[in-house]
């Protein structure tokens, strides 16, 4: 496990695996890696994101798969995310001729310190080709769910950041004959676009 932007072994492993699959991985920002699948047929560009960094914590689980690196552990599952992204890359490469559009694979560093995505965004993550939509995933370590369970939020619900925003719209009541003297919170809330 490696922490933050200091991921030389992880980045090298990802780039080597992608190259062996037939990709031409690209560096993005301080330590991110990008690869493109498809692009031979017209269509949209979908970004598939997975993070790679570990936590600066000494692992004391005693498990046979416990970290052997002092003071660093994958306690949040990003090692699984990296493996899952490489698995997706393999499947996408095997079916590349069937892809309409492009899938941009993003291997993100520094998620745990809330800096990796911003660094990659500032360095062209969403360009060349321009990204139309993004998909991310996260394992739920410690959740009492059956093996193989996938949780998918309802339509329009996303959480690909470390923050949530809660917006409260306050209005001012009045009479329907004088809408100019009122503040309708329902109309205002319906017009908020984030």
Name the predicted role of every residue range:
Residues 1-74, 83-100:
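Acidic/His- and Gly-rich active-site-bordering loop/insert found
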Residues 54-56, 78, 141:
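Short, glycine/acidic-enriched loop or turn micro-motifs at the edges of active sites
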Residues 63-73, 80, 92, 97-194:
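Histidine/acidic-residue-rich, glycine-tolerant segments that coordinate divalent metal ions
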């Amino acid at each position: 496990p490696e922490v933050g932007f200091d991921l030389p072994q992880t980045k090298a492993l990802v780039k080597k695996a992608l190259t062996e699959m037939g990709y031409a991985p690209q560096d993005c920002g301080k330590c991110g890696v990008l690869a493109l699948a498809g692009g031979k047929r017209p269509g949209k560009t979908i970004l598939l994101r997975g993070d790679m960094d570990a936590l600066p914590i000494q692992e004391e689980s005693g498990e046979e798969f416990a970290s052997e690196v002092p003071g660093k552990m994958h306690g949040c599952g990003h090692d699984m995310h990296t493996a899952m992204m490489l698995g997706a890359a393999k499947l996408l490469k095997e079916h590349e001729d069937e892809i309409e559009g492009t899938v941009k694979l993003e291997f993100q560093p520094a998620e745990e310190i809330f800096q990796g995505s911003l660094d990659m965004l500032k360095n062209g993550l969403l360009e060349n080709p321009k990204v139309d939509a993004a998909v991310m995933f996260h394992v739920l370590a410690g959740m009492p769910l059956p093996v193989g369970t996938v949780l998918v939020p309802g339509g329009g619900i996303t959480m690909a950041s470390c923050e949530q925003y809660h917006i409260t719209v306050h209005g001012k009541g009045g009479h329907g004959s004088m809408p100019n003297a009122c503040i309708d919170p329902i109309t205002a809330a319906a017009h908020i676009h984030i």
